[in-house]
Amino acid sequence: FSVVANSLPYLWKGFQYTVQLTAISAVGGLFFGTLLAMARLSSLKLLSNFAAGYVNLMRSIPLVLVIFWFFFLVPMILQGVTGGDRPPQVGAERTAIITFIMFEAAYFCEIMRAGIQSIPKGQVYSAYALGLTYGQSMRLIILPQAFRNMIPVLLTQTIILFQDTSLV
């Protein structure tokens, strides 16, 4: 048991990093997922198609591949764009945070979109009848109700995110 006891400080540090990475990625993914969901539900076809393409692409690629692409390919792309003689170093921690946020945003987008669409259209029409704008009706009426419906699925996706942090 001495091996386990000697490893406890390292395990504790790893646990703290895992929780930190999960929290940052969940908050960032939820923020960008909400924006993507609003874009997917937009009446602007270009915006809606871009968001749908992003979500479909990210959900069809394994996370480990996204991490590898970001870590190895993005520095080469940045070198080509900036014209530098060496590719800039992105860093492992920055790669992990950015890729997890990008990846989870696609999943949170679908959860958010389903939650928003679960609210009856009468709620939206009532908000418009009260004189609220689209943004006000979403912020004050639709999203609070939708979040209540989405909490179980959002927590499940966050648990999956916690498990996915083992890749980094």
Annotate each language-model stretch with its function:
Residues 1-168:
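Transmembrane alpha-helices and adjacent helix-loop boundaries
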